[in-house]
Amino acid sequence: MSGKKAAARLMIQGTSSNVGKSVLAAAFCRIFYQEGYHVAPFKAQNMALNSFITRSGGEMGRAQVVQAQAAGLEPDVRMNPVLLKPTGHTGSQVIVLGKAQGTLSALKYHGDYQRKTWPIVEEALHELLEEHEIVVIEGAGSPAEVNLKQNDIVNMRVAKEAQAPVLLVADIDRGGALASVVGTLELLEPEERQLVQGIVMNKFRGDIKLLQPALDFLEERTGIPVVGVVPFYDQFKIPEEDSVVLEEQNTSKRDQGKSRDEALDVAVIRLPYLSNFTDFDPFEDEPDVILRYVREPSELGEPDCVIIPGSKNTLSDLRFLWESGLGEKIIKFWQEDVPIIGICGGYQMLGRIVRDPLGTESDLKEIAGLGILPMETEFELDKHTVQSRGKVVGGELFLARCQGTEITGYEIHMGRSQGEGHSLFEIEAQETAYGDGMSAGSAVGTYLHGIFDNDPLRTALLEWLWERRGGTRPVGETMSQAAIREQSFNELADWVRNSMDMEKIRAMMGLHKG
């Protein structure tokens, strides 16, 4: 033993999915970071279509990337050693320590394979505990799923291994929060229940005085203190974990009330297997943009720009475009000179054909693309995952405004595309230089996720779209994405800190009062 003081731990578990665990974990990461601690996030297993590529080329869940940024750290795949990316209703691609291991059915994964990943999870957890002063751990779903408990590697088994005090979070905005807390605790084993040292009511609306009798009841019934009631607030500009947030509405709350006269209309196709929709978060931060997600042709209207996003199942989503009529509508828009942008899987769909002879994504062997870009794509077994850096070299459309501009992004794809056009970007990644992207008429495609996080490129696009309307952009210079992110982390930390009994939380963690 090195004699080094053991890291303090705190684990956030929930009564169900989507109660706010990821955001609260990010808040605690920033709170402790502000207090001068060296803090790291950890989630043993995540299931999400939003992923990120680390500097070393490893793939991990976006939520832990956000938490790492809140903690002032470079993302590390050990923070999310197991990532499941759904490829269909019953199967997922399994990614372990950043590398794809293949696609398994839910039944096969929750059997032997999940048990085999526990030593990897265990090692990653203990390494982070050795290297940091505090580790903020996030659970998944609910710890009371009795049908999954036998092979659990993400909830109470992690809490026991880390000897971490657990905060149990309920979403009171949904209703039934008291029953969900009591029911969850009733279904836990006695030794698991002892680990739960605090209850948090999240997303509360109204006067807390009216809630106090319920809080008193919870404490008396469970013997566990309520350590926080976090008021509802949905304006934090923190990237969301998964596309469940898109199910509630097709237009961002930040965009409601904007008229088409004062804002550009950007329509993103809501693919069934849409991935990395955080690519479009920068548009939500622009005061002159309305960002919409559309599922069918009738919802498209007359957008200033149509974006086909990334996909975890490109061939199936391409089939969806054809069967829904969206494919024909997009082609018609392109013929009418409406700007069309494809990102990763969306880029592949813009080509002439997509082939998957080895069945890497689905049972479909090939399907006709939209035929807008002069290229063809074929899927291979090897997954290309890199952080990319480069510059704009293609002079088409809005890119003519930012020639030579340096850009960053990341790539996650198994398809290789070949075509006749000139590259739009000159990329350097892992000591290799290559071209990326293609354009034809009003259409542009690229493999780069995160492309719109590049402030000069995004600004060039928006100015170009306004000029196409016959006007000039009505807003001046806006905050950079980096500045917006930092401001949001600090606001989130203040919001949560002021809603929590931080003295009790520090005490359960073994920390002195900050």
UniProtKB/Swiss-Prot annotation:
**InterPro entries in the record:** Class_I_gatase-like, CobQ/CobB/MinD/ParA_Nub-bd_dom, CobQ_GATase1, CobQ_N, CobQ_synth, GATase_3, P-loop_NTPase
Q: Could you tell me which pathway this protein works in? A: Cofactor biosynthesis; adenosylcobalamin biosynthesis
Q: Where is the GATase cobBQ-type domain?
A: 263-457
Name a biological process GO annotation: cobalamin biosynthetic process
In terms of NCBIfam families, this protein maps to:
cobQ, PRK00784.1
The question of whether Transferase is a record keyword is answered with: no
- The source's superkingdom equals Bacteria
GO molecular function terms attached to this record: ABC-type vitamin B12 transporter activity; catalytic activity
Name the gene that codes for it.
cobQ
In its UniProt entry, what is this protein called?
A: Cobyric acid synthase
Identify which residues the record assigns to the active site. Answer: 344, 449
Would the keyword ATP-binding be found if you checked this record's keyword annotation?
no
Query: What are the protein's UniProt keywords?
Result: Cobalamin biosynthesis, Glutamine amidotransferase
Its job? Catalyzes amidations at positions B, D, E, and G on adenosylcobyrinic A,C-diamide. NH(2) groups are provided by glutamine, and one molecule of ATP is hydrogenolyzed for each amidation.
Q: Which family does it belong to?
A: Belongs to the CobB/CobQ family. CobQ subfamily.
